[in-house]
Amino acid sequence: MARNDIRPIIKLKSTAGTGYTYVTRKNKRNNPDRITLKKFDPIARKHVEFREER
């Protein structure tokens, strides 16, 4: 029970508009705001910003 409360599963969606997503977990205590990470988008074939989707 407690595992999913502290570190929920989130989707990171590409801002390039390709619709590609990464699935990961985040720590709500350390990062209460939405996460943005630069990761590789294989459809766009470049590194782009991925934002947390709620």
Swiss-Prot record:
Q: Which domain of life is it from?
A: Bacteria
Q: Which Gene3D superfamilies match?
A: Ribosomal protein L33
Q: Which Pfam families match?
A: Ribosomal_L33
GO molecular function annotations of the record: structural constituent of ribosome
Ribonucleoprotein among keywords: yes
User: How is this protein annotated for GO cellular component?
Assistant: cytosolic large ribosomal subunit
Keyword Ribosomal protein annotated:
yes
Q: Which biological processes are named by the entry's GO terms? A: translation
Print the keywords alphabetically. Ribonucleoprotein, Ribosomal protein
Its family remark reads: Belongs to the bacterial ribosomal protein bL33 family.
Q: What is this protein called?
A: Large ribosomal subunit protein bL33
The organism of origin for this protein: Corynebacterium kroppenstedtii (strain DSM 44385 / JCM 11950 / CIP 105744 / CCUG 35717)
